[in-house]
Amino acid sequence: QKYILENTLIFSNLFGVVKASDHLPFYKFKQGAKINNFAIEKFYKEHFSKALNEYLKNEELLDLRAGFYDKFYTPKRKFSTYKFIKKGKVVSHFAKAYRGILLALCARIKAKNNAEILNHLPSNLSLKEIQNKGLKEEIVLEILD
């Protein structure tokens, strides 16, 4: 738990970027919800990106966000994402569960980089390929079960 509290940022549709250790009130504001004509993702991208780049400047970036939150922030340096494939198709509905499995793995092994994560993958995940697209390193994992 300490690892997650110290190493995880969460993108909230209402509060923007928060630390896992931040205390937030209970709220219901669904992903993609709108407040009149206010584009919340545009607001966060315009007003928080510079501070977030500064905060993360010395960190290895592992981006486990849902694709929706790409609109909130685009890293300005190398970062890694994970994509999950099952039977040749991209997993979207259960991707959140697999991102959670990776985060739990990171916490368990106190991962500092992707090599450590890939060396400790659970038996139901296998490295399929690594694609480099500009600053983004996309690690594709095959779900075996």
Q: Could you describe each region identified by the protein language model?
A:
Residues 1-145:
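Internal, well-folded beta-alpha domain core
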